[in-house]
């Protein structure tokens, strides 16, 4: 995770690294228990199925889309699936699905080049000046944690796939966050040694990020 973002973090909530950490972090954000990760999976499965044609385009083909759909289905042995990489929470893939289902901005903070903001691909944003929650996941050694950010903090650039596939009624989602995107770009260049950031890939098809680690005790930082 980028060092310059640390002063803008209000709180970090860890979850157990047992193969479900990304889904557990979403559950915690929604005020549920970590054990509700199966419900989160179920809701995201329905979102993906209901809009399958849109996601085939976003994920650059049916093969990737089916892989993500299969990965959302929980394994029969929920206690022993930490090693089943295909069942983990992957980004950027899940960023789009979560943003669309919950109708809010999703932030993933990881390396400089791969941190992204995800917005709903359809539906307009809420009325101006209405506070909209932001779901933020941080990636620490391939393990996802829930992050609460301070108001007005820097936010990473919008997903390339969002720009390429957003519907007309979703065009203005980014507008309220442009200043925060700009705040992210300036220190990002400094931290990367004054080198311009590597361009993001045009497709989600290659090199997804997997979010999980072997099981470890839960702690709240």
Language-model-detected regions and their locations in the chain:
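Deubiquitinase catalytic domains
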Residues: 84-219
């Amino acid at each position: 995770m980028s060092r310059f973002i640390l002063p803008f973090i209000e709180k970090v909530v860890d979850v157990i690294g047992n193969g479900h950490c990304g889904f557990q972090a979403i559950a915690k954000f929604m005020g549920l228990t970590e054990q509700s990760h199966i419900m989160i999976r179920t809701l995201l499965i329905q979102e993906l199925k209901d809009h399958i044609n849109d996601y085939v385009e976003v994920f650059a083909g049916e093969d990737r889309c089916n892989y993500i759909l299969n990965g959302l289905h929980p394994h029969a042995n929920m206690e022993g699936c930490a090693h089943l990489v295909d069942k983990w929470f992957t980004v950027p893939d899940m960023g789009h699905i979560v943003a669309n289902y919950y109708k809010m901005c999703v932030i993933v903070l990881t390396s400089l080049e791969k941190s992204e903001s995800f917005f709903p691909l359809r539906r307009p944003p809420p009325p101006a000046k209405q506070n909209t929650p932001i779901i933020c996941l941080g990636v620490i050694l391939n393990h996802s944690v829930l992050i609460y950010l301070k108001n007005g903090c820097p936010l990473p650039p919008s997903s390339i796939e969002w720009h390429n596939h957003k519907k007309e009624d979703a065009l203005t989602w980014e507008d309220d966050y442009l200043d925060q995107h700009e705040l992210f770009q300036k220190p990002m260049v400094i931290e990367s040694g004054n080198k311009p950031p590597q361009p993001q890939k045009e497709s989600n098809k290659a090199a997804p990020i997997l979010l999980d680690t072997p099981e470890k005790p839960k702690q709240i930082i």
